[in-house]
A protein has these predicted regions:
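Carboxylate-rich, polar loop motifs that coordinate divalent cations or form catalytic acidic clusters
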Residues: 1-203
């Protein structure tokens, strides 16, 4: 009995100090970011981009955390390249590593080289208010009030793709690709629509 116990102790000792255990507890470093660090407000959404920056969307502006410092972006009325509004409710990074920010007063695309924002507008020159976004091949789809817009990578243009004329109060709050040629559109109060991207027909 004593011999068996001694053998078990020796085996345990060898495993402990030679790293033979297949599962080792990992060590993780956590840092809390709060208002004291410059966090604008209540967090609404978070995105980690391709370069490792953490983007934090809040009710009072946008934050970018690099692991050491938090930089804040807010709307400035005299700056056309600031974010359109401080209330941020969604962010996404597309296949070209563009970061799109959906705000209460329009959508914005972050420009890394100039560290500011491009604000696309419609034919009338007004900011495009969008509620949802998804990433098909070749561009970005945005859901708006009874409309869907498409941003084309090739010519960097934003155009109206679809108008739901029979559904004047249809706010497209969720977009997802059903298949390669079909888009599923969801409205919080008005139900679902399936849109054929080739024909423009929906039901």
């Amino acid at each position: 009995m004593r011999k068996n116990i001694l053998v078990l102790l020796c085996v345990a000792f060898i495993i402990q100090f030679t790293g033979l255990l297949p599962l080792q507890a990992g060590h993780y470093y956590y840092k809390q970011i709060s208002l004291k660090d410059g966090l604008p407000s209540t967090v609404r959404c978070i995105l980690t981009d391709e370069q490792g920056f953490v983007w934090i969307g809040t009710r009072s502006g946008l934050g970018r955390y690099d692991g050491h410092e938090l930089k804040k972006y807010v709307h400035q009325a005299d700056d056309p390249h600031s974010i359109p509004h401080n209330f941020i409710y969604q962010m996404i990074e597309d296949e070209q590593n563009n970061i799109w920010i959906l705000t209460d007063k329009g959508v914005a695309r972050y420009r890394r080289q100039s560290d500011d924002f491009f604000i696309p507008t419609n034919e009338s020159g007004n900011n495009i208010i969008v509620y949802s976004v998804c990433l098909p091949k070749g561009g970005v789809l945005f859901g708006s009030k009874n409309k869907i817009f498409f941003y084309n990578y090739q010519d960097a243009s934003l155009r109206l793709l679809q108008s739901f004329e029979r559904e004047p109060n249809y706010n497209v709050t969720l977009l997802t690709l059903w298949d390669e040629h079909t888009l599923l559109c969801c409205s919080r109060w008005q139900g679902l629509l399936l849109l054929d991207l080739k024909t423009g027909k929906y039901n």
